[in-house]
């Protein structure tokens, strides 16, 4: 019975995934990869994770990516390696030779352009991607029960204004914090932090 409910939950979540119907990741193979590199990548699943600064819950182009993580999964043993790409990393964004911050690739052309730029500049082949916004992060942290963070006085000075903005952007309820020091943050408070 537990397995049935678990499978049902996973299917419900999968049905909530927003995908661009005009973008097929399999069309974004990296033509620049050497044959030996392609052979070395067999048995691995490479996923680009994009965290967008979206206040209207949109996930497509027009949003800057504040978080870019490349996750590489060894399918034989389940080992996962993560690499964070700094949003201000200056890379070649498209075929016309335009260089800019990598977070601009997603803003200009959504996941398609971001994946193409990452593949080309980092000599990788991204097999899949996921995009998440503030609400998804807040909901995930709430599901996990929150997080404990030590807030300095300087951080406390600003955080409540960001909490208000995050509540308005996500529609997820939260409360202002009362003091600096150790605080147990809910999802919205953690996103604001």
Predicted regions and their residues:
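Non-catalytic, solvent-exposed segments at the cell envelope interface
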Residues: 4-193
């Amino acid at each position: 019975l537990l397995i049935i409910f678990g499978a049902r939950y996973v299917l419900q979540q999968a049905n909530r995934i927003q995908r661009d119907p005009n973008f097929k990741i399999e069309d974004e193979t990296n033509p620049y990869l050497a044959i030996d590199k392609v052979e070395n990548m067999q048995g691995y699943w490479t996923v680009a994770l994009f965290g967008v600064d979206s206040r209207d819950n949109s996930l497509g182009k027009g949003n800057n990516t504040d978080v870019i993580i490349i996750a590489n999964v060894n399918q034989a043993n389940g080992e996962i390696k993560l690499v964070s790409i700094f949003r201000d990393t200056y890379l070649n964004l498209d075929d016309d030779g335009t260089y800019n911050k990598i977070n601009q690739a997603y803003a200009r052309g959504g996941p398609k352009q971001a994946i193409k730029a990452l593949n080309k500049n980092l000599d990788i082949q991204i097999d899949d991607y996921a995009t998440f916004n503030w609400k998804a992060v807040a909901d995930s942290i709430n599901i996990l029960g929150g997080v404990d963070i030590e807030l300095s006085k300087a951080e406390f000075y600003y955080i409540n204004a960001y909490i208000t903005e995050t509540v308005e952007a996500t529609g997820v309820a939260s409360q202002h914090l009362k003091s600096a020091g150790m605080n147990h943050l809910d999802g919205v408070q953690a996103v604001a932090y």
